[in-house]
């Protein structure tokens, strides 16, 4: 009977306990008395005693868990209650809240906002009319004298709270920031529309909140320009604990993944993107004045053309076919020149399925233009005028200082004073290597490829397969010529084997009328006199197709539509392209391309620990895009 009663007791306990909970308890109880020991061959009294021990242990364990849970909840409730009390009775500063764990802070802040909604207050109003920007306010009233208070002028401003300081219960200071400037809000109960509302609004506001302020311009006795509010409105509460400006936001992973937070806390980031915008604006204005027409071309193409690069592939459901993301807009531009639009340009995104490193991002911005009745000599002059004028317009000088290894590394002076240095690729390579290369007319032979291969091996210059002549030359140029280019330098007259879209050199057989502009060892521009012979163009496309078949993923496809367009006649034309991102890096002294992209490509956080970074070399031939 006792055994049956015990079994009923156990079954009752099982009914009250979920199987998941029972499984956990069984595992823990098994350490005291495993169920496998409760065997029928033991005497009944032993089995009864063992079962009692187990039930007693299970009960103690359950009581212990309940106490721990109750204690944790009690501590959290006490913390929440204390913080909630501070939220309404701490002179509005909320300093104690900022000692909390960020998760607790978020919970408390969310509850406070929910309470506002329940009470009928809208913490997210639809509209707040702003009379004057913070920048304009500072410009117009900075002349005030200490102690001035213009009670006859009432203005409305808005911004984000970055600091909150109480000087007693009736005087609270806020640092309001926006547009890269700071304005102090001097909230005094005497000037507010009512004492009760003064207390209420200041108890609500926290660092990070976006607020609207209606008040009078003034200056404190210490000379701090301020707005003295008659009324303040919560426009959008910040639910997260905002890092203090004193410490800033320095972690790069957080900065790149949460760019909005980076912009809130780091004004230098805002300045970089202002400079980026100025660069694009200057280029547009420069080309517009030369009579160029800005155009837009497709970003998804049946054939990826215009550059030697590996494309991204997507799929079009309706057409039931693969499409390629644009690697360069060049071929479309030249078709438009065939159609009679003699000067065209486009500023836009390109996509290349290649490596991510300090100077490469799979999605990047370029400017390309094509100019009928011009050659690469004309484009060198235009490049010098554009870049030197841009640098001087934005920085005030032709010379800039750049830190390629970061702020703590060595500083270099880059001089954009025209004219820029010019070197011929093959001649300079022979000079630096101290060897005589085969005649450029023989660069397409296997003998030349073997000579270049041997030079790379002897000089320990790495070149992953396929070790084609074009790739070997590109590696040698990168190793021995590009590294000498600190101030702007044109590397000119590339071999035809490296430039399937460029026109052959009018004086040097085997070469093309092409140049690349390097600054601080990095390519920023690429341009050439365009090949407009449809027969020769088709031959070069076929050679590229052979290279692709041999394993070169970056080799070009044959574009029949483009070849057909050339058959209608492309006038003598020169084409040019520049990487906006790299130019921005130099003018903002940034050594990482992620610093000048608002939302750079990043590995998913759960993969960043295990994924290995890959580095892909720059293309040996681009459209004039880089």
Curated annotation (Swiss-Prot):
Binding site for ATP: 352-354, 360-361, 523-524, 579-582
Secretion signal span: none
Keywords in alphabetical order: Acetylation, Aminoacyl-tRNA synthetase, ATP-binding, Cell membrane, Cytoplasm, Ligase, Membrane, Nucleotide-binding, Nucleus, Phosphoprotein, Protein biosynthesis, Secreted, Transferase
GO molecular function: amino acid binding; ATP binding; ATP:ADP adenylyltransferase activity; identical protein binding; lysine-tRNA ligase activity; protein homodimerization activity; scaffold protein binding; tRNA binding
Membrane topology: Peripheral membrane protein
Modified residues (N6-acetyllysine): 117, 170
Residue span of region Disordered: 604-626
Record text about domains: The N-terminal domain (1-65) is a functional tRNA-binding domain and is involved in the interaction with DARS, but has a repulsive role in the binding to EEF1A1. A central domain (208-259) is involved in homodimerization. The C-terminal domain (452-597) is not required for interaction with AIMP2.
Subunit structure: Homodimer. Part of the multisynthetase complex (MSC), a multisubunit complex that groups tRNA ligases for Arg (RARS), Asp (DARS), Gln (QARS), Ile (IARS), Leu (LARS), Lys (KARS), Met (MARS) the bifunctional ligase for Glu and Pro (EPRS) and the auxiliary subunits AIMP1/p43, AIMP2/p38 and EEF1E1/p18. Interacts with AIMP2 (via N-terminus) and MITF. Interacts with TARSL2.
Record function comment: Catalyzes the specific attachment of an amino acid to its cognate tRNA in a 2 step reaction: the amino acid (AA) is first activated by ATP to form AA-AMP and then transferred to the acceptor end of the tRNA. When secreted, acts as a signaling molecule that induces immune response through the activation of monocyte/macrophages. Catalyzes the synthesis of the signaling molecule diadenosine tetraphosphate (Ap4A), and thereby mediates disruption of the complex between HINT1 and MITF and the concomitant activation of MITF transcriptional activity.
PANTHER family per UniProt: LYSINE--TRNA LIGASE, LYSYL-TRNA SYNTHETASE
Protein name: Lysine--tRNA ligase
Organism encoding this protein: Rattus norvegicus (Rat)
Taxonomic lineage from the root: Eukaryota, Metazoa, Chordata, Craniata, Vertebrata
Gene: Kars1
């Amino acid at each position: 009977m006792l055994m049956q009663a015990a079994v009923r007791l156990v079954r009752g306990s099982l009914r009250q306990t979920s199987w998941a909970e029972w499984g956990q308890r069984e595992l823990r109880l098994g350490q005291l008395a495993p169920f496998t020991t409760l065997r029928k061959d033991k005497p009944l009294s032993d089995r009864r005693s063992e079962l009692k021990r187990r039930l007693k242990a299970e009960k103690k364990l359950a009581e212990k868990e309940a106490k721990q849970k109750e204690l944790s909840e009690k501590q959290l409730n006490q913390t929440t209650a204390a913080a909630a009390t501070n939220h309404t009775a701490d002179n509005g500063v909320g300093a104690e809240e900022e000692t909390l764990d960020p998760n607790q802070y978020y919970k408390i802040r969310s509850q406070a906002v929910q309470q506002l909604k329940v009470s009928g207050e809208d913490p997210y109003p639809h509209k707040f009319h702003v009379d004057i920007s913070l920048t304009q306010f500072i410009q117009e009233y900075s002349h005030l004298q200490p102690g001035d208070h213009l009670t006859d002028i009432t203005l409305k401003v808005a911004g984000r709270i970055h600091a909150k300081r109480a000087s007693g219960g009736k005087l609270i200071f806020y640092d309001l920031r926006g547009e890269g400037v700071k304005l102090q809000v001097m909230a005094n109960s005497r000037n507010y529309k009512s004492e009760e509302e003064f207390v209420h609004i200041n108890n609500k506001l926290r660092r990070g909140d976006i607020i609207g302020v209606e008040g009078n311009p003034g200056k404190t006795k210490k000379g701090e320009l301020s707005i003295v509010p008659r009324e303040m409105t919560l426009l959008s509460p910040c639910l997260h604990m905002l890092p203090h400006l004193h410490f800033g936001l320095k972690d790069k992973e957080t900065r790149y993944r949460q760019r909005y937070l980076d912009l809130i806390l780091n004004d230098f980031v805002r300045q970089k993107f202002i400079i980026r915008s100025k660069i694009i604006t200057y280029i547009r204005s420069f080309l517009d004045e030369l009579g160029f027409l800005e155009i837009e071309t497709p970003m998804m193409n049946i054939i990826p053309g215009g550059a030697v690069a590996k494309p991204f592939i997507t799929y079009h459901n309706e057409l039931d076919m693969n499409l390629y993301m644009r690697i360069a807009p060049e071929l479309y531009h030249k078709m438009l020149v065939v159609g009679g639009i003699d000067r065209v340009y486009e500023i836009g995104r390109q996509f290349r399925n290649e490596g991510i490193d300090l100077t490469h991002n799979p999605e990047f911005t370029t400017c390309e233009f094509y100019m009928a009745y011009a050659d690469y000599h004309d484009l060198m002059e235009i490049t010098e005028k554009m870049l030197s004028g841009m640098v001087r317009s934005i920085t005030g000088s032709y010379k800039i200082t750049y830190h390629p290894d970061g702020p703590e590394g060595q500083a270099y002076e880059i001089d954009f004073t025209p004219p820029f240095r010019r070197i011929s690729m093959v001649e300079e390579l022979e000079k630096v290597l101290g060897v005589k290369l085969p005649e450029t007319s023989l660069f397409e032979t296997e003998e030349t490829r073997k000579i270049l291969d041997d030079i790379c091996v002897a000089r320990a210059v790495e070149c992953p397969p396929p070790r084609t002549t074009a790739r070997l030359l590109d590696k040698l140029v990168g190793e021995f010529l590009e590294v000498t280019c600190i101030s702007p330098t044109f590397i000119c007259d590339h071999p035809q084997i490296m430039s399937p879209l460029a026109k052959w050199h009018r004086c040097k057989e085997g070469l093309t009328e092409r140049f690349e502009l390097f600054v601080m060892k990095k390519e920023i521009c690429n341009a050439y006199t365009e090949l407009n012979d449809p027969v020769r163009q088709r031959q070069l496309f076929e050679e590229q197709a052979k290279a692709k078949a041999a394993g070169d993923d970056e080799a070009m496809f044959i574009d029949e539509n483009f070849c057909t367009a050339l058959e209608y006649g492309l006038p003598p034309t020169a084409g040019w392209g520049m990487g906006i991102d790299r130019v921005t890096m130099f003018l903002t002294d940034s050594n990482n391309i992620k610093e000048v992209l608002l939302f750079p490509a990043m590995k998913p956080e759960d993969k960043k620990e295990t994924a290995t970074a890959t580095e892909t070399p720059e293309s040996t031939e681009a459209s004039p895009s880089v």
